[in-house]
Amino acid sequence: MMIILFNCFFCASFREDGQHPTVSLGGVWGAAKELHEDKEFHQSDVHVFIIMGASGDLAKKKIYPTLWWLFRDGLLPEQTYFVGFARSALTVDAIRTSCMPYLKVTETESDRLSAFFSRNSYISGNYTAGGSFSELNAHIMSLPGASDANRLFYLALPPTIYHSVTENIKHFCMSAKGWNRVIVEKPFGHDLQSSEELSTHLSSLFTEDQIYRIDHYLGKEMVQNLMVLRFGNRIFGPIWNRDNVACVVLTFKEPFGTQGRGGYFDDFGIIRDVMQNHMLQMLCLVAMEKPASTNSDDVRDEKVKVLKCIVPASMSDVVLGQYVGDPEGEGDAKLGYLDDPTVPKGSTQATFATVVLYVHNERWDGVPFILRCGKALNERKAEVRLQFTDVPGDIFRNQCYRNELVVRVQPNEAIYAKMMSKKPGVYFTPEETELDLTYKSRYKDVKLPDAYERLILDVFCGSQMHFVASDELREAWRIFTPLLHQIEKEKPKPIPYKYGSRGPAEADELEKRVGFRYEGTYKWVNPHRL
C-alpha cells in the first residue's frame, strides 16, 4: 500500500496560484489503475462513507474537503456515496455552504463539485437512540446497490459519546455482506485506564482489523518518509545508533495560543494533545528496528517493541511552561493563557512541555530522546533532529561542530544535513553548511496530498500501517500516565514564558544537561525562498 500511495500522488501537478493542486489526467488514470489492482480496493463495489458528527468543525474543515479532493481526482471507487449524520437539522445544501471555504474549488470544477454533492445525503438523529440508527440504516439501504455495500464509519465526535455511537453502529448499521470499518479520532482515552476501557469496549464490538485509530500526523509526507530514509539508504544504517548519535530532538511548535479553545485544551494539556500521540509516533519511526516488510502488522509490531523499551517519563526530566502575554505584542500576542475567558481561573495547565525519554535497548541505550512542544511560540515548526557525536581526534582546534540530520515535517517539507566544509577562498578553516533537499524545490511538479487524503484512502484500501494499534496505544499511555497523574496530583506551577518566544529557558538548560549541544553559530536559511 505504501508503494501505491507514493506512485499515485507523485504524478500530480503543483499549482502556484494558491488553489489546491489537482492530479493530471494521466496521473488519475495511473493512480486509479494501481489502486484498482490492490486486492482490498474493489472499484466495482459499492461503498458508503458515513460521517458521524457531520455538523461539526472537523467534518466541515477536514472530512468533507478530503472526500471531495479524493472524489475529484478519481481516487475513490466509482460507486461511493456519502451520508452525514448529526443531531442538527441540516440539508446537503447547508453542508455544502458551510464547507465551501475549505474545499478550494476552481472555476472549472463546479460541475465535478455538483456531482460530488449529488452523492451526498444527510440524516438527523440522536446519538444515543437506537431508533435513529435504525432510520440511518434504512436510509443507507435505500441507496443504489447498498445491500452489498462496504461501509466506512468516521467518528468525528467527542469521545464522551463513542460508547453509545459504536454500540448503535454495531447493532443497527453494519453491512451484512460487505466489510465494515470504523475510524476513531483521538483522544483515545485520558490515561492508561480510560484508554484500556475504550479499547476493551471497541474490541467487544469490532475486530482489530475493523478499527482505524487515526493520528493524522502519520499521514504527513515527511513522517511517512522516515521509514524510506532509514531503511532505503545504506549510508544511514551504520550510524543510526548509540555509538554515533548523541541525542534526538523531536520538536512541535505552534505560533498561536488557545484562542477561545482554552476550556477544551485545559482538560487535556499539551502532553495529551501532542506529545503522547504525534510525537511518540515519530519517535517510534526514528528508533524502531527494520520491520520484516512494509506489511501493516510487521511495521506496527516493531513500533510496539521499541515502545516497550521506554521507561515511564520522570518528573526530573520534565520542564512545563505556560505562556503569558507580551506587552509589546500585537493582537492575541498581548494575551496570556489565563486571559482566555474559557480557561478556569488560576489554571496550572501546561501549554509547553519538554520531556526526555530513554529507549533501553542495544541500539539506543543512553541516548536521550528530547520531546519539545508548545503553543504561542516563535514559529510554526515540526521536525526530527538527530545530533551526532563529536568527531574523534579533532585536528581543527575545536572549530568543528556536531553534524545534524534534520527532517522538517512542516512547514516546507525538507531533509537537510548540517556538516562541515572548508571555507571558500584562501582560508583553510572549517565552516558549517548544509546538504539540502527541500521538497518544493526538488519536486516542483509534485502534489503533496493532505494527511487526511492519504489516511482515508488507506481505509478504503484496507491498509492499517499508518494507524495506531491497540497495543501501541497501551504502551504509549503506560509511558505517560504516571507523569500525568503526578502533575494532576501535585499541580506544579508551570514556568511562564512570553507569547512569541522560544519557550522557557529552563527547557534549553534541560536539553544541555542531557547532552544536546546548541552551538548558536548557525541557523539554517532556506535557500529556495519558499
UniProtKB/Swiss-Prot annotation:
<feature type="binding site">
    <location>
        <begin position="436"/>
        <end position="438"/>
    </location>
    <ligand>
        <name>NADP(+) 2</name>
    </ligand>
</feature>
<feature type="binding site">
    <location>
        <position position="375"/>
    </location>
    <ligand>
        <name>D-glucose 6-phosphate</name>
    </ligand>
</feature>
<feature type="binding site">
    <location>
        <position position="381"/>
    </location>
    <ligand>
        <name>NADP(+) 2</name>
    </ligand>
</feature>
<keyword id="KW-0313">Glucose metabolism</keyword>
<keyword id="KW-0119">Carbohydrate metabolism</keyword>
<dbReference type="Pfam" id="PF00479">
    <property type="entry name" value="G6PD_N"/>
</dbReference>
<comment type="pathway">
    <text>Carbohydrate degradation; pentose phosphate pathway; D-ribulose 5-phosphate from D-glucose 6-phosphate (oxidative stage): step 1/3.</text>
</comment>
<protein>
    <recommendedName>
        <fullName>Glucose-6-phosphate 1-dehydrogenase</fullName>
        <ecNumber>1.1.1.49</ecNumber>
    </recommendedName>
</protein>
<feature type="binding site">
    <location>
        <position position="518"/>
    </location>
    <ligand>
        <name>NADP(+) 2</name>
    </ligand>
</feature>
<feature type="binding site">
    <location>
        <position position="408"/>
    </location>
    <ligand>
        <name>NADP(+) 2</name>
    </ligand>
</feature>
<keyword id="KW-0521">NADP</keyword>
<dbReference type="InterPro" id="IPR019796">
    <property type="entry name" value="G6P_DH_AS"/>
</dbReference>
<feature type="binding site">
    <location>
        <begin position="216"/>
        <end position="220"/>
    </location>
    <ligand>
        <name>D-glucose 6-phosphate</name>
    </ligand>
</feature>
<dbReference type="GO" id="GO:0050661">
    <property type="term" value="F:NADP binding"/>
</dbReference>
<dbReference type="GO" id="GO:0006739">
    <property type="term" value="P:NADP metabolic process"/>
</dbReference>
<dbReference type="InterPro" id="IPR022674">
    <property type="entry name" value="G6P_DH_NAD-bd"/>
</dbReference>
<feature type="binding site">
    <location>
        <position position="273"/>
    </location>
    <ligand>
        <name>D-glucose 6-phosphate</name>
    </ligand>
</feature>
<dbReference type="GO" id="GO:0006006">
    <property type="term" value="P:glucose metabolic process"/>
</dbReference>
<feature type="binding site">
    <location>
        <position position="385"/>
    </location>
    <ligand>
        <name>NADP(+) 2</name>
    </ligand>
</feature>
<dbReference type="GO" id="GO:0005829">
    <property type="term" value="C:cytosol"/>
</dbReference>
<dbReference type="InterPro" id="IPR001282">
    <property type="entry name" value="G6P_DH"/>
</dbReference>
<feature type="active site" description="Proton acceptor">
    <location>
        <position position="278"/>
    </location>
</feature>
<feature type="binding site">
    <location>
        <position position="186"/>
    </location>
    <ligand>
        <name>NADP(+) 1</name>
    </ligand>
</feature>
<feature type="binding site">
    <location>
        <position position="380"/>
    </location>
    <ligand>
        <name>D-glucose 6-phosphate</name>
    </ligand>
</feature>
<feature type="binding site">
    <location>
        <begin position="53"/>
        <end position="60"/>
    </location>
    <ligand>
        <name>NADP(+) 1</name>
    </ligand>
</feature>
<feature type="binding site">
    <location>
        <position position="410"/>
    </location>
    <ligand>
        <name>D-glucose 6-phosphate</name>
    </ligand>
</feature>
<feature type="binding site">
    <location>
        <position position="502"/>
    </location>
    <ligand>
        <name>NADP(+) 2</name>
    </ligand>
</feature>
<dbReference type="GO" id="GO:0009051">
    <property type="term" value="P:pentose-phosphate shunt, oxidative branch"/>
</dbReference>
<feature type="binding site">
    <location>
        <position position="372"/>
    </location>
    <ligand>
        <name>NADP(+) 2</name>
    </ligand>
</feature>
<feature type="binding site">
    <location>
        <position position="524"/>
    </location>
    <ligand>
        <name>NADP(+) 2</name>
    </ligand>
</feature>
<comment type="similarity">
    <text>Belongs to the glucose-6-phosphate dehydrogenase family.</text>
</comment>
<dbReference type="InterPro" id="IPR022675">
    <property type="entry name" value="G6P_DH_C"/>
</dbReference>
<feature type="binding site">
    <location>
        <position position="254"/>
    </location>
    <ligand>
        <name>D-glucose 6-phosphate</name>
    </ligand>
</feature>
<keyword id="KW-0963">Cytoplasm</keyword>
<feature type="binding site">
    <location>
        <position position="87"/>
    </location>
    <ligand>
        <name>NADP(+) 1</name>
    </ligand>
</feature>
<dbReference type="Pfam" id="PF02781">
    <property type="entry name" value="G6PD_C"/>
</dbReference>
<feature type="binding site">
    <location>
        <begin position="416"/>
        <end position="418"/>
    </location>
    <ligand>
        <name>NADP(+) 2</name>
    </ligand>
</feature>
<dbReference type="GO" id="GO:0004345">
    <property type="term" value="F:glucose-6-phosphate dehydrogenase activity"/>
</dbReference>
<dbReference type="InterPro" id="IPR036291">
    <property type="entry name" value="NAD(P)-bd_dom_sf"/>
</dbReference>
<comment type="function">
    <text>Cytosolic glucose-6-phosphate dehydrogenase that catalyzes the first and rate-limiting step of the oxidative branch within the pentose phosphate pathway/shunt, an alternative route to glycolysis for the dissimilation of carbohydrates and a major source of reducing power and metabolic intermediates for fatty acid and nucleic acid biosynthetic processes.</text>
</comment>
<feature type="binding site">
    <location>
        <position position="186"/>
    </location>
    <ligand>
        <name>D-glucose 6-phosphate</name>
    </ligand>
</feature>
<keyword id="KW-0560">Oxidoreductase</keyword>
